[in-house]
């Protein structure tokens, strides 16, 4: 299957999942409960958590690279 189609489907799922509380249909329908078993609050905090982890890892890698390059210049 094409990657673009998979990414579009995941994005559509995420958007619907994050918009459920706005229309107050999160727990009203059993089909919705089956399709979206985790609370929509998780959909809001998930990108924040992933961004924090990404920035932390990027900063750590850049810091290690800067320290290593500085040590090589001194030797």
From Swiss-Prot:
Transmembrane regions listed in the UniProt entry: 5-25, 42-62
InterPro entries: DPM2
Gene Ontology MF terms in the entry: enzyme regulator activity
Keywords: Membrane, Transmembrane, Transmembrane helix
Entry's localization field: Membrane
Protein name stated in the entry: Uncharacterized protein YIL102C-A
Pfam families registered for this protein in UniProt: DPM2 (PF07297)
GO cellular component: endoplasmic reticulum; endoplasmic reticulum membrane
GO terms (BP aspect): dolichol phosphate mannose biosynthetic process
UniProt topology in membrane: Multi-pass membrane protein
Coiled-coil regions listed: none
């Amino acid at each position: 299957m094409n990657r673009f189609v998979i990414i579009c489907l995941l994005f559509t799922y995420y958007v619907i999942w994050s918009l459920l509380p706005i229309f107050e249909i999160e727990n009203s329908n059993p089909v919705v409960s089956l399709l979206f078993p985790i609370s929509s609050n998780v959909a809001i905090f998930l990108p924040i958590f992933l961004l924090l982890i990404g920035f932390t890892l990027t900063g750590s890698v850049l810091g290690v690279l800067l320290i290593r390059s500085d040590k090589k210049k001194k030797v």
